[in-house]
Amino acid sequence: MGGRGMGISELKLPAAVKVHELADAKTLAATLAHDVAERLRAAIAAKGQACVVLSGGRSPVPFLEKLASEPLDWAKVTVSLADERWVPVEHADSNAGLLARHLLTGAAAKARFVGLYQQAENLDAAALKADQALTGLPPIDVLVLGMGDDGHTASLFPASPNLEAGLDLASTRRCLPLLAPSVPHQRLSMTRSLLASAAFIALSVQGPGKLATLRAALAGNDLTEMPIRAFLHDPLDIYWCP
């Protein structure tokens, strides 16, 4: 891992957090896909259906492709997104488009997809429509989160309007409109209350930069400063590679 590199094992993590330290990005993608699929198979065996909520961005592509090739009864799986950019599915920045290209192909195309993007006159109206659409989402069996260098997760960004509502565990909202510092700014995000309801939560992070972000997140407790903190003290499985 290089002389200077610090491993994730050196972080002081809460008792409920389990760490999977992988050799490289390829191994992380394969291991996470295997573990997610195993939990989805168990959910199908137990109750006849499974629900997985995934995150967008560039880094999950190898994981999504690995997950698509896992032997699963995809017709019994509901797939949704922790957050979405308020752009049509055809847009290059669409998380739904990302899933369509890299996950919902072959056998996995049989899965039911519940997206967040809604056509509406403005972002607030779109979030209300998404909130309604999510009433049909089964209980979440598996949630896979990512984390930005600023400590955001899903589209729960520090300094965004609606962030406090998005982090409120007592909130009955499933989806809220939020603003990202980067383009496209307008986002739709599942709320913490919905995300935290997942039976199994994985956080997938790569590289020393994300390790430094995790260290900073663990050192404080202001959720609005680093929203990932909202998930670091619940049962959580962190998948990390250098």
From Swiss-Prot:
Which Gene Ontology BP terms does the record give? carbohydrate metabolic process; pentose-phosphate shunt
- List GO molecular-function terms, semicolon-separated: 6-phosphogluconolactonase activity
Please tell me which top-level EC class this enzyme sits in. hydrolase
Q: In which pathway does it act?
A: Carbohydrate degradation; pentose phosphate pathway; D-ribulose 5-phosphate from D-glucose 6-phosphate (oxidative stage): step 2/3
Concerning Pfam families, the annotation shows:
Glucosamine_iso
The record's section on InterPro entries has: 6-phosphogluconolactonase_DevB, Glc/Gal-6P_isomerase, NagB/RpiA_transferase-like, PGLS
Specify whether Hydrolase is a keyword of the entry. yes
Q: Which Gene3D superfamilies match?
A: 3.40.50.1360
Q: Any idea of its EC number?
A: 3.1.1.31
What reaction is this protein's catalytic activity? 6-phospho-D-glucono-1,5-lactone + H2O = 6-phospho-D-gluconate + H(+)
Domain of life of the organism encoding this protein: Bacteria
Which key words tag this protein in UniProt? Answer: Hydrolase
CDD domains (alphabetical):
6PGL
| Cystine pairs | none
The similarity annotation says: Belongs to the glucosamine/galactosamine-6-phosphate isomerase family. 6-phosphogluconolactonase subfamily.
Functional summary from the UniProt entry: Hydrolysis of 6-phosphogluconolactone to 6-phosphogluconate.
Supply the name of the protein.
6-phosphogluconolactonase
